[in-house]
């Protein structure tokens, strides 16, 4: 286990943006994405890092990007630090295993969410309206039930510290243009369809996940991350019992802990006990091992 990385600051490299988890550097023709060990919940960044989290997210994303290359191109140029531009070499030790050299795409202003099961905020919305994001669903569904077909439920991409908002597909077409919106929706459903078949063979249920897309040289490509414990809800197939919440190995463990606190879900975040940090790190490593076969 390496020393946790909360923030990066590389002399000689231009920091373009610092997101909830990733630090993005502008290398001119390309971008350098560095995945820290930060973790957020309810759109608030916690004060403590989760050891090895950056490695886990990078490896899992790389795995899924490779699996989907015949469906949609992705933004990765290389994950091998030795192939990065010379300006990155002095920082190779810190970059190794947690960074990607990527194409400079123009991101769509939406997050592309696909749900295969009724869970989380979708379950709350279904209980009150019988629908999720305006999509009517059959009556009588229980929490964590599998949906007859996966549904596409886009959201806005909120600024740091604010909350994403679910939007209709028609609103997405207004924001992105109909052609790009339809492409992103179709890619999202195809990727999810393949991923859940592959995950099923590994004893994993992908209940829902989200993707981001961008335009590079006139082509819509998938960017950011791909089906990680940060962006997905992973359940164990052997433990699946619809009718209530499911044991998961993703960020839900941390969310559940925070739900039990007297905290208003706005910054500043509460301090995380050592055992919660350790258990969260264990969940992330288990996701890596089950999905890719790689152990840390």
Swiss-Prot record:
CDD domains: SAICAR_synt_Sc (cd01414). Keywords: ATP-binding, Ligase, Nucleotide-binding, Purine biosynthesis. It catalyses: 5-amino-1-(5-phospho-D-ribosyl)imidazole-4-carboxylate + L-aspartate + ATP = (2S)-2-[5-amino-1-(5-phospho-beta-D-ribosyl)imidazole-4-carboxamido]succinate + ADP + phosphate + 2 H(+). Pathway: Purine metabolism; IMP biosynthesis via de novo pathway; 5-amino-1-(5-phospho-D-ribosyl)imidazole-4-carboxamide from 5-amino-1-(5-phospho-D-ribosyl)imidazole-4-carboxylate: step 1/2. Its EC number is 6.3.2.6. It comes from the Bacteria. One of its GO terms (molecular function) is phosphoribosylaminoimidazolesuccinocarboxamide synthase activity. InterPro entries: SAICAR_synt/ADE2_N, SAICAR_synth, SAICAR_synthetase_CS. Belongs to the SAICAR synthetase family. NCBIfam families: PRK13961.1, purC. This is Phosphoribosylaminoimidazole-succinocarboxamide synthase. It comes from Pelobacter propionicus (strain DSM 2379 / NBRC 103807 / OttBd1).
